[in-house]
């Protein structure tokens, strides 16, 4: 859509999308706030502190791969916050690849992570692009803690991680919970 706005936040009308918009505004990074409902997008953006100084554009899209590809054209990075990712992610990641953009999301859904690794990772790498799911604090912090625990400790054969939260889940998070319980769960045993 615009080479002047290198970041597209897809799902910017949600809680995480607003936080990302706030971060981008703070660092003077131009962005497109995209989603399925212009009125909700505009309302959420009004609540971003200092938004009046941001270089951003609100774009409504119905979410088809073709339409998303047009919205993403000219951007460098697509930040997908529209879960459940197992349902909403495939079209967004395909459009990001079509538009030649790096892709990241805030998901933590195991089925979606497996799909990105199995279907999309190599396609992005072949084009010199990055597909990075699960970049939000829930997944990223746990991953960093696990790596720190295992550094230099080859004898550990089991590590269980529990992430606990305070507060109430958002509507989007609730939808993700119900999506996840309908998918198969996997675990590594002896790293296989």
PLM segments and residue spans:
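N-terminal Rossmann NAD(P)H-binding glycine-rich loop of SDR-like oxidoreductase domains
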Residues: 5-27
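Active-site-lining helix/loop region of Rossmann-like oxidoreductase modules
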Residues: 10, 15, 151-192
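Residues in the short beta-alpha loop(s) of Rossmann-like NAD(P)-binding domains
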Residues: 13, 36-38
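NAD(P)H-binding glycine-rich loop region in Rossmannoid oxidoreductase-like domains
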Residues: 30, 40-115
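Rossmann-fold NAD(P)-binding glycine/threonine-rich loop
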Residues: 107-130
């Amino acid at each position: 859509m615009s080479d002047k706005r290198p970041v597209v936040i897809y799902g910017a009308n949600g809680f995480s999308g607003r936080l990302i918009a706030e971060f981008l505004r703070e660092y003077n990074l131009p962005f497109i706030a995209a989603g399925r409902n212009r009125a909700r997008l505009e309302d959420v953006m009004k609540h971003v502190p200092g938004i009046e100084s941001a270089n951003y554009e609100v774009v409504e899209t119905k979410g088809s791969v073709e339409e998303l590809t047009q919205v993403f054209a000219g951007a460098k990075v697509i930040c997908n916050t529209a879960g459940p990712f197992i349902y909403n992610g495939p079209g967004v990641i395909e459009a990001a690849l079509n538009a030649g953009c790096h892709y990241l999301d805030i998901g933590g859904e195991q089925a979606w992570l497996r799909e990105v690794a199995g279907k999309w990772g190599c396609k992005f790498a072949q084009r010199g692009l990055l597909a990075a799911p699960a970049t939000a604090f829930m997944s990223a912090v746990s991953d960093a803690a696990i790596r720190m625990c295992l550094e230099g400790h080859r004898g550990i054969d089991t590590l269980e991680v529990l992430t606990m939260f305070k507060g109430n889940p958002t509507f989007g998070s609730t939808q993700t919970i119900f999506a996840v319980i309908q998918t198969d769960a996997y675990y590594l045993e002896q790293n296989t």
